[in-house]
């Protein structure tokens, strides 16, 4: 059984709802899922998972501080140990959505392996957005090969 870690930060609850949908998709694909807010996630969480989903809201065309905090704290303790670990990203926004680029850039610095296109959600995740988030979770679980 694959272990999928979902690390996110949320201000209004939209990104939390998106994280929950990603978790539903990963669980439906047979993965064991751990969801943590960026402020409480630890570098060991990243080392112990088989795949990771990174989610945030748009903060002035950048990822939110909670996710950035986790990535800052995790970089050096995990350096060279997470290369090619499958990852996917999701992002909620009110109109721009350009902050997803910051997540993908930092994931590249970790040398994580992108296994699905990012899901961008304008506002509250509903309808097709929920389906896309669940699919993202399933793809992430499948990418581990376990």
Question: Residue ranges of each PLM-predicted region?
Answer:
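Short polar catalytic/cofactor-binding loops
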Residues: 9-13
């Amino acid at each position: 059984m694959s272990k999928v870690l979902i690390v996110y930060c949320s201000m209004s609850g939209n990104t939390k709802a998106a994280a929950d949908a990603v978790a539903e998709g990963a669980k439906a694909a047979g993965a064991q899922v751990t969801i943590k807010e960026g402020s409480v996630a630890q570098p060991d969480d990243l080392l112990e998972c088989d795949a990771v989903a990174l989610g945030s809201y748009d903060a002035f065309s950048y990822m939110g501080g909670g996710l950035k905090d986790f990535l800052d704290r995790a970089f050096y303790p995990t350096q060279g140990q997470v290369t090619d670990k499958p990852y996917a990203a999701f992002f909620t926004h009110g109109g721009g959505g350009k902050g997803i680029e910051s997540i993908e850039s930092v994931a590249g610095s970790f040398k994580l392996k992108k296994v699905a296109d990012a899901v961008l959600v304008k506002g509250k995740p509903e309808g097709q957005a929920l389906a896309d988030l669940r699919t993202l979770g399933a793809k992430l679980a499948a990418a581990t090969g376990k």
